[in-house]
Structures are given as structure tokens and as C-alpha cells.
């Protein structure tokens, strides 16, 4: 059974230990199919979100911060007037983990609201 974005968005991040290997290329490919508009960049996934104004951009960034705090998994965020770029990687393992995809799915779900 394939994982859907809704399945990913309902999962919780698990603590990542350095001994855990990064996801395989096959696992990454399968999980990327569940995300809309995210780009795979080797050891990271990234998406740019656009908004009408600075207030909406910052409201979204604050919501992402709340999700990140709850999941204890934090992205790199670049903010502009009416856009923001979110990039995930799991630094502890030097690559991508399921946690990156869980958080990306949660953010995508938030953006649809």
C-alpha cells in the first residue's frame, strides 16, 4: 500500500540517532510522489510558498515554527516579502529521513487551509 500525503501528515516524527542511515533513493522517490511541488536536491527537499503580502508570509512562517517545535524537527527557512522557502534535511544522519517528509506533508496540509 502506498503512503499518501494524508498518511504522512498524521504521523509523528521520531527521534533520529546518528547511527540511523539516511533514506535510500527508492524510499525517497516513493515519498516524493506524495508531496506536491517539493524539489529533491540530493540531501534536502525544498519548496517555495507564495503569498499575497508580508503579513500572510509571516503568519505561515510562524505556523511552520509551531509545527517544527511540536515535531522537534526544524527546517531552514528563507523569508521574503511575499514568499518563503522551506528546506528540510536531517542533519544528524547527513541526509533525508522520514521526518523530513512528515513535516513537509504537515506544511502542505497547512498551506491548503
UniProtKB/Swiss-Prot annotation:
HAMAP family: Pterin_4_alpha (MF_00434)
SUPFAM superfamilies from the UniProt entry: PCD-like
NCBIfam families per the UniProt record, alphabetical: PRK00823.1-2, PRK00823.1-4
Catalysed reactions listed for this entry: (4aS,6R)-4a-hydroxy-L-erythro-5,6,7,8-tetrahydrobiopterin = (6R)-L-erythro-6,7-dihydrobiopterin + H2O
Keyword hit for Lyase: yes
Alphabetical list of InterPro entries matching this protein: PCD_sf (IPR036428), Pterin_deHydtase (IPR001533)
One Pfam assignment: Pterin_4a
BP-aspect Gene Ontology terms: tetrahydrobiopterin biosynthetic process
E.C. no: 4.2.1.96
Lineage: Bacteria, Pseudomonadati, Pseudomonadota, Betaproteobacteria, Nitrosomonadales
UniProt family annotation: Belongs to the pterin-4-alpha-carbinolamine dehydratase family.
Protein name in UniProt: Putative pterin-4-alpha-carbinolamine dehydratase
Enzyme class label: lyase
GO molecular function: 4-alpha-hydroxytetrahydrobiopterin dehydratase activity
Keyword Lyase carried by entry: yes
Keyword list, A-Z: Lyase
Amino acid at each position: 500500500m502506498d503512503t499518501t500525503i494524508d498518511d504522512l501528515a498524521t504521523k509523528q516524527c521520531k527521534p533520529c540517532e546518528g547511527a540511523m542511515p539516511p533514506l535510500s533513493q527508492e524510499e525517497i522517490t516513493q515519498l516524493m510522489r506524495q508531496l506536491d511541488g517539493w524539489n529533491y536536491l540530493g540531501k534536502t527537499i525544498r519548496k517555495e510558498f507564495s503569498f499575497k503580502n508580508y503579513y500572510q508570509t509571516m503568519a505561515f512562517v510562524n505556523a511552520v515554527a509551531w509545527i517544527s517545535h511540536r515535531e522537534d524537527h526544524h527546517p531552514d527557512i528563507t523569508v521574503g516579502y511575499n514568499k518563503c522557502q522551506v528546506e528540510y534535511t536531517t542533519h544528524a544522519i547527513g541526509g533525508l529521513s522520514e521526518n523530513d517528509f512528515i513535516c513537509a506533508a504537515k506544511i502542505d496540509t497547512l498551506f491548503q487551509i
